[in-house]
Amino acid sequence: MVSRVAEVAVVGAGYVGLVTGASLVRIGHRVTYVDKDGERVAGLRDGRMPVYEPGLEELVARGTGAGRLSFTEDLDAAVGRADVVFIAVDTPQGDDGAADLSNVSAVARGIGRALTGSARRERPLVVANKSTVPVGSGDYVSTVIREGAEEAGGLDPSEEVRFGVASNPEFLREGSAVYDSLFPDRIVVGAEEAWVVEVMRGLYGPVIEQSFPVEMDPRPRVTVPFVVTDLASAEMIKYAANAFLATKVSFINEISDLCELTGADVGSVATGIGLDGRIGPRFLNAGIGWGGSCLPKDVSALRAIACEHHHDTNLLDATVAVNDRRRGLVVSKLRRDLGTLGGKRVALLGLAFKPNTDDLREAPSLGIAAELLSLGAGVVGYDPVAAKTAARQVPGLRVVFDPYEALTGAHAAVVVTDWEEVRNLDLRRAASLMQEPKLLVDGRNAMDPAAARGAGLLYRGFGRG
């Protein structure tokens, strides 16, 4: 088992890598971030964050100031002094829907090379995969590490153990990732060797035992389950978890459509079924569907794995089909009350795929904005952190940083992302700024329908009769 204070290298200073490393520093370890992007490394050294995540910038600054967190482009040096190396690089979706492992492969090969020559080591190294990868990738990473070592001169056969591979999937929610890292529902570690599991158990000991100091009382967790399994099962857990969450959202959205047809209220239905312990209340918010960097990519990758094994994915296919229809429903609701969209002004309230992040990957706002623009509408978008990036991605989209500026002169507004600034809008002020019919399409069911109508808005939600 590693000592209480471990030397950790995190390869990939992106969203997952930054949160992982900063959280490990928070519980007492020393972390070196490794990234091949020199500009990113220089920016991080100067305190510039490449991603927006509440609490992350402060956590990184705290670790850097304490001398426990550093940044480098030198993989060899970082591997040479590490007890554990995390692979936390992007695995983008390929044209066939499968995860592209080229970044993971490049890092694994580099680790293998670093295990030879000047980086020869007396203690074994754990290589833990944080990247979301297909089932079987743990064995693949091990093979590529050995190939890299052989290319650089080979591993010394006289040494009993040089490295071991673990799968340690992340379950971070954008917008609350720091919290999720320190107070997780569970920690999953897949490995084929007992010593690898014990190294990871020691690394996460302060989180498992909740023994690190915190400012809150009481703690959100007493202890954290440490789930030990084989490599393949750990890799499948990640995909299965996200696919299930996507399916749950698509299910309630299907029910919301039926609620509109029958006069039922999907909020009441969600409350009624969510109190069943077998179902639970989370991910039962009807609206314009799921997006982001994880659910779409992971559902697609799981379908690709099934296709590779000649297995049908009828449920996942339906999950995706239901979600794909949601954006079109927004446009349909606008057309129903505005008639032609040509010459109409529409305000999009929120552009990121969810609150408290600047992530626009698979964000519903982008497709909605593009379709409205193609139909001749003028579209202005508001988002407190993602506006500038959205404007670069959607030609013709005008962005502002004040929701009331977005609403000024708008015939309709669409709640796309339920930021606190959007949920807490002064609805009477909003109505006073808009043009008739003062339509509010609530894509997140975030507003009180009675309050909206009382303020003079024409309210349209999802599944609310």
Where are these regions (language model features)?
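Structural/interface elements that position substrates and couple domains in central-metabolism enzymes
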Residues: 1-465
